Curated annotation (Swiss-Prot):
GO biological process, one term: homeostasis of number of meristem cells
Signal peptide extent: 1-26
InterPro entries associated with the record: Kinase-like_dom_sf, Leu-rich_rpt, LRR_dom_sf, LRR_N_plant-typ, LRR_Rcpt-Like_S/T_Kinase, Prot_kinase_dom, Protein_kinase_ATP_BS, Ser-Thr/Tyr_kinase_cat_dom
Name by which UniProt lists this protein: Probable LRR receptor-like serine/threonine-protein kinase At5g45780
Length: 614
């Protein structure tokens, strides 16, 4: 009996030991043989190779097991390092080859520092890299051909360095590149065919070929081997002097011609009253002068204000060609450097989808940062749900489901199809606009990150509206695609109830957080009571239950329990098919309408609630 008991105890200890060992092995998947997180070791090597006079890397500690809390380091929900945003930090030294060990990296921004030495070829090991910006440094040597192995690379900027040699064919031929900037280096040789949709190679005097507009020549310089006699040499000198004199005369005549042409051109400009600031275009984006924006908005007249929120004031504007636009005048422009602002604007401009608000252009001065969008005549979903639009059509049940579908399509594009991927971080009814056909247009994407440049860490500033912010984002500052899924679930509830996420009323149910109120009604099978009274009972009971179930699934407290937006989209597409199949008008269901007595509060920024379209 004692022997059997001893065997049983030994077997239990053995099972416990190996279960603990398995757990430790799982935890050690990120550890090196010395017990140090390999990403920590790689980041420390990057730090040690750099000179950090501003001590922005002082928080990077070799004894730390989690680099996700470090400045300028962004991580995925699984804990892998996916972004290093170290632009304009006064860093010098070299870029360590250990950068190639951060194999989950999606974004690497090191522009506007003073880094020297070659660009590490180990960057070619970052198979998931989508955005690489090393511009405005002093990198020398050749462009590593290994960058051509980065098949996910969408944005590559190496401008304003000291790079030499030829442009690698592998890099030029990257089919996924949307933007390539190699301007203002010392590159030479023939320029290969460049696959990027938008590229720049100006400022490389020794580049030749069609892309550089300089012809390549295979001719070699002819050496001087004339062997002339002194008499012939004298005649030769006379010819040279005559030729030089002719060149000088021609040069003087050319200067006189140029002088008179400038006078004529200036008078022509004066007569046509063309007085515009310097402007240029970035791809399809137009850069407006400040004077143009002033004129379009009647000098930022209060009569043209469409709304005000955490990102700044929004004005209605009229361009000379009759186009109506919405101008977003960003707050605190001094915190975003011109190059950084231009980089972020280019990334936002690359996101083009029928359910996304297209960026039309921008304005950038030392004191101002403004974004120009098409004007949405039907305002936002929040406007339609809560404001009186007179005789304009209201949002019926089918239209609300269709709006949810359109918004989902826009978010799926941002999360899974846009390159680089974009997390919205403030999905709500006020940021879903309606075009002429009442199709949902997702607005304000990319702006939270654009204004986070003042922060040293990619996610230190929590941006969003109380009630719409996912719990993990609010508590840790770490955002992911699941953060937007939470906000989308809240949007569905806003469409169903017609109320803000944080609302108070005087009915039998006094609502604070709409989410908890809906959960209570759902548990009690009282679905009809949560429906907006403006629908007058005309809604589909079965679709309502499924939509509520979907919204509550999207707003699960833990991000891993929430579906991906692509999964949400599939469910909504099925529900839209049911709605399009039609439904008979039902007797008005019991619904309670509560007054919007309190405005939404905001965390760090105010809620962007616009009284008119943006």
């Amino acid at each position: 009996m004692e022997i059997s008991l001893m065997k049983f105890l030994f077997l239990g200890i053995w099972v416990y030991y190996y279960s603990v060992l398995d757990s430790v092995s799982a935890m050690d998947s990120l550890l090196s043989p010395k017990g140090v997180n390999y990403e920590v070791a790689a980041l420390m090597s990057v730090k040690n190779k750099m000179k950090d006079e501003k001590e922005v890397l002082s928080g990077w500690d070799i004894n730390s097991v989690d680099p996700c809390t470090w400045n300028m380091v962004g991580c995925s929900s699984e804990g892998f390092v996916v972004s290093l945003e170290m632009a304009s930090k006064g860093l010098s030294g070299i870029l360590s080859t250990s950068i190639g060990e951060l194999t989950h990296l999606h974004t690497l921004l090191l522009q506007n520092n003073q880094l020297t030495g070659p660009i590490p070829s180990e960057l070619g090991q970052l198979s998931e890299l989508e955005t690489l910006d090393l511009s405005g440094n002093r990198f020398s040597g050749e462009i590593p051909a290994s960058l051509g192995f980065l098949t996910h690379l969408n944005y590559l900027r190496l401008s304003r360095n000291l790079l030499s040699g030829q442009v690698p064919h592998l890099v030029a031929g990257l089919s996924g590149l949307s933007f390539l900037d190699l301007s203002f280096n010392n590159l030479s040789g023939p320029t290969p065919n460049i696959s990027a949709k938008d590229y720049r190679i100006v400022g490389n005097a020794f580049l030749c070929g069609p892309a550089s507009q300089e012809l390549c020549s295979d001719a070699t310089p002819v050496r001087n081997a004339t062997g002339l006699s002194e008499k012939d040499n004298s005649k030769h000198h006379s010819l040279v002097l005559s030729f030089a004199f002719g060149i000088v005369v021609a040069f003087i005549i050319s200067l006189m011609f140029l002088f008179f042409w400038v006078l004529w051109h200036r008078s022509r400009l004066s007569r046509s009253h063309v007085q515009q600031d310097y402007e240029f275009e970035i791809g399809h984006l137009k850069r407006f002068s400040f004077r143009e924006i002033q004129t379009a908005t009647s000098n930022f007249s209060p009569k043209n204000i469409l709304g005000q929120g955490g990102f700044g004031m929004v004005y209605k504007g009229y361009l000379p060609n009759g186009t109506v636009v919405a101008v977003k005048r960003l707050k605190d422009p001094i915190y975003t450097g011109e190059v950084q602002f231009q980089t972020e604007v280019e990334m936002i401009g690359l996101a083009v989808h029928r359910n996304l608000l297209r960026l039309f252009g921008f304005c950038m001065t030392p004191e101002e940062r403004m974004l120009v969008y098409p004007y949405m005549p039907n305002g936002s979903v929040a406007d339609r749900l809560r404001d009186n639009y007179g005789e304009k059509p209201s949002l019926d049940w089918n239209r609300r489901i269709s709006i949810a579908l359109g918004a989902a399509r826009g978010l799926v594009y941002l999360h899974e199809q846009c390159n680089p991927k974009i997390i919205h971080r403030d999905v709500k009814a006020a940021n879903i606009l309606l075009d002429e056909s009442f199709e949902a247009i997702v607005g304000d994407f990319g702006l939270a990150k654009l204004l986070d440049q003042r922060d040293s860490h990619v996610t230190t500033a929590v941006r969003g509206t109380i009630g719409h912010i996912a719990p993990e984002y609010l508590s840790t500052g770490q955002s992911s695609e699941k953060t937007d899924v939470f906000g989308f679930g809240v949007l569905i509830l806003e469409l169903i109830t017609g109320h803000k996420m944080i609302d108070q009323g005087n009915g039998q149910v006094r609502k604070g957080m709409i989410l908890s109120w809906v959960r209570t009604l759902k548990a009690e099978k009282r679905f009809a009571e949560m429906v907006d009274r403006d629908l007058k009972g005309e809604f589909d009971d079965l679709v309502l239950e499924e939509v509520v179930e979907l919204a509550l699934l999207c707003t699960q407290p833990h991000p891993n329990l929430r579906p991906r937006m692509s999964q949400v989209l599939k469910v909504l597409e099925g529900l839209v098919e049911q709605c399009e199949g039609g439904y008979e008008a039902r007797a008005p269901s019991v619904s309670r309408n509560y007054s919007n007595g309190h405005e939404e509060q905001s965390f760090i920024i105010e809620a962007i609630e616009l009284s008119g379209p943006r």
